[in-house]
Amino acid sequence: MFRNKIVLEEKFRLNVERLLYALVFTMVFEGLIRKLLPSAVGLLIFFLKDIFCITGLYFITKAFAKPNVQRNPFFNLRKIFFFVFLPPLIVTNFYDPSLVLFALKQYLLYMILALLVPLAFVPAKIERFKKFFFFFSLTVIPTTLVAVLQNSLPANHWLNQSVDGQSLEAFSAGGLLRVSSTFSFTGQYSWFLNVVCVILAVSFCLPIKRDNIIIKKIAPLLPLVISVCLAVGAFITGGRTAVLGCGLVLFLGFIFAVIKAPQKIITRGLILMAVMGLSLTALRIAKPEFFKVYDLRSEDKKDETHSEEVEGRILKDMFGWTVWIAEQDMIPFLFGNGLGVMSNGAEKISSYARDVRMQGISTESEIDSTAWEGGMYLVLIWFGMRIWVIIRCIGLWRQARDTNTIIAMSFLLGYITVIGFYGALSRQPPIAIWFWLSIGCFVALYYYDKSLQSSNA
């Protein structure tokens, strides 16, 4: 009986693990697959990540129904947030009932990944968790190869077109196309690079066992190959989100690591920075075309420098909404104009969202969208929840003791902090999925550290 229970639990854990692998694979290669398949099948691929998350919700319901399961630090977050989320949801129902389920998906569904990852990778399965990080970091190689191929192809080639077969020349910079690699559009590629640079840092801190002859042979070269691919990928997109985002999350992760483990991280960090600096210099000399689009987008303009432009965009994103929200009527001011309206795809399921778009109403930043969709109420609870998540993660990070785990958690915390403050979690499912997945990885590492502390006690 006891043996059967262990077998069933391991089978359950493996199913959750496979689901996470399938989710990451789909997220990375969705755009390329949709370009290769008919549009009707491509639409199914588009919703596949949501189907995986709904399946994950079933696994979570089943797992947490057991009385002896370890309670996740974020277990009650989804339930509590659902109840405080009700007022703008009720208001949305008056605008268009079809938006209610869509809004729940956009704001709440992907939170389940914070619970799902620790179910798949329990402390006793740390080697399998390391392999997951290793697999995730390896995806940089094929995505960069596709991006390099796109960079050498004309704009009218099918690989450089959208998933609907339309030209993407409108998104070019200085007449040069901004590549999207295996993703549906350039932004998705940039968001992927932001998270995978952190996953790469984690896989360096927690390397897999070299118990395979192939891994033994390629392991010494892989860190350099993946790092170079990451650098090429970040610059070849031509997007500042990729370059500045990767730099910021790695820098913040490094700061967190220095605070908790200065002896181990400072020397390694300086060596890594020197290697990356030399690699970038060599790449610029050998392949200047990889940097051309980014350089064009980063040039100083006549009326402002590049740094002034970036600063202006950030300030506009953070405070631009305060100009127009005071002009709203009382109900829109407090509870918004309908959740999910500003998200991609809303116009396909909602006539109200379609009418709003036809009126030319649009928002740029996350806080703009939140204020327009849910009013001041949603701004307070949505960003309050995100700040609470960051503070909760910092609390867990402070409890960690194992040096390698601390460093790995520090880089994840850097990503969680940056995206938690600035990421478009309500508008862009890919960002939300990477964000909550990274929190799940963070919690799983926290559990692993706790198990090490218990075994050493």
Could you say what each language-model-derived stretch is?
Residues 133-161, 171-174, 181-259:
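Alpha-helical transmembrane segments of multi-pass inner-membrane proteins
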